[in-house]
Amino acid sequence: MASLKNKHFMIGLSLTFIVALFSFLAAKLPILDKVGALTIAILIAILYRHFRGYPEQYSSGITFSSKYLLRFAIILYGLKLNIFDIIGQGSKLLAIDVGVVIFSIVMMLFVNKLLHGDKNIALLLGVGTGVCGAAAIAAVAPIFKSREKDTAISIGIIALIGTIFSLIYTAIYAIFSMTTNVYGAWSGVSLHEIAHVVLAGGFGGSDALKIALLGKLGRVFLLIPLTIVLILIMRFRSSESSSKGRISIPYFLIGFVIMALVNTYVTIPSVLLNILNTISTICLLMAMVALGLNVAFKDLKNRALKPLMTIIITSICLSSLAFIVVHWLYS
């Protein structure tokens, strides 16, 4: 019996790995490189669920990917941060980053209320839009006690919209006259994922990409204080409503902070850093596959439309406002 359970666990884990690896490699191909590995992984998982059903007998391995590998990926995500670089970028860019995070969450909740959408998904999308997409959503989902299908829907939506917006940014840069500093800062402070920032920022050249990444990594850094604030708010609301539900601290975020400190104070060889970043990406993709397997098409039909409209409206407002502020400060 134990050997059978172990076999089912390994099959479930292998399923998420195979789809993740395929998505990782497929995202390097022309056209698909614009779609992104996250979007590919989630779409394949949802399609698998639709045509083959949820592989219940392999759920232990799938659940391991969606929980533990996801947390491990977020811990390694901290290696993308160098605190000295973020502090050294100056107060202007960091101040914009703070404004972007606050605006994204508040605007998302405001639009969601007008559309009578799901508040939990709106919160996840607000944090994801303001900070760093899928990783931020996965980090705060335990704080909000989000269901796995809501987390998967949110990540799928933000991966899709971020890809579309990054392509729109490149078109705008090609058509309109814009300095590399303005374009880079605009991309960095307003696009959803690091991959989207790289896609759009790289189109403006190395100088634009450099300032874009600084702007984006400043937002990633803000994940640390943001989660602390969210935990305090949720605990206050929980005690105020005399709820017995305890708001737990996502301790893997401590690992995220430790990795950020390690990358700041320790010189890690570039080869090792690239290997660790690849491992982080694969683990994150495996988690996305596992989350996607929890989403049925009826869930997308019933729960994704309003959040999709909400994030589009919010992203348009964010991009417009960010451009005005960046143009004013960097022109």
Swiss-Prot record:
Which keywords has UniProt assigned to this entry?
Cell membrane, Membrane, Transmembrane, Transmembrane helix
Classification via InterPro entries: UPF0324_pro
Q: Can the keyword Flavoprotein be found in this entry's annotation?
A: no
**An example Gene Ontology cellular component term from the record?**
plasma membrane
Q: What membrane topology does this protein have?
A: Multi-pass membrane protein
The record's Pfam families line, in alphabetical order, gives: Cons_hypoth698 (PF03601)
Q: Does the keyword Membrane apply?
A: yes
List where in the cell it is found: Cell membrane
Regions crossing the membrane: 9-26, 31-48, 69-88, 93-115, 122-144, 154-176, 183-202, 217-234, 247-269, 273-295, 308-330
The entry assigns this protein to a family as follows: Belongs to the UPF0324 family.
UniProt protein name: UPF0324 membrane protein SA0329
